[in-house]
């Protein structure tokens, strides 16, 4: 008896997936739970992939810095964020530069708090970002009860500083108290 090792449906889904990644020019993607070990491995793999593209060192540093902060802020497991579901992390490259995408399911209230922090960061110029960064570092040293909020805003400030761009975000309703929260950062 001959065993079927594949089906047309599987091949079609692979072809659809490949066409989608090619169309959007994704060079790196991951979907799953983000443990510390997974984050380390993702950073290592993405670094090798970007090195192979032979980009300028300044661009590599920007991308790597944004990646680290996205993975720490948006993707990693945190009880405070109100989610233990899979995260998604993507990098694409086109003629305009690189785009980093990160997202995960969150409780609605946490997503709205995160969007408020991003809106606050997006309104600041570079000097104001530096001032806010210093202020939050001082607050963090006091180990206040807003520890995770201060860590989050520090990561968002780093993303804005390194990319030199606004942080774009999207909140999509998924179910009762949950939303899918994603960010998109352009790096030139």
Stretches found by the model and what they are:
Residues 20-54, 122-134:
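Helix-loop-beta hinge of the Bergerat
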Residues 3-17, 97-99:
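N-terminal intrinsically disordered, cationic/polar leader segments
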Residues 165-171:
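Glycine-rich ATP-binding loops of the HATPase_c
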Residues 26, 96-100, 181:
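Short beta-strand element(s) in the Bergerat
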Residues 44-68, 141-146:
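Conserved short strand/loop->alpha-helix "switch" segment adjacent to the catalytic nucleotide/phosphoryl-transfer site
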Residues 179-188:
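Short C-terminal beta-strand
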Residues 95-150:
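Glycine-rich/acidic phosphate-handling loop/turn and adjacent ATP-lid/helix
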Residues 57-92, 157-162:
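Conserved ATP-binding N-box helix of the HATPase_c
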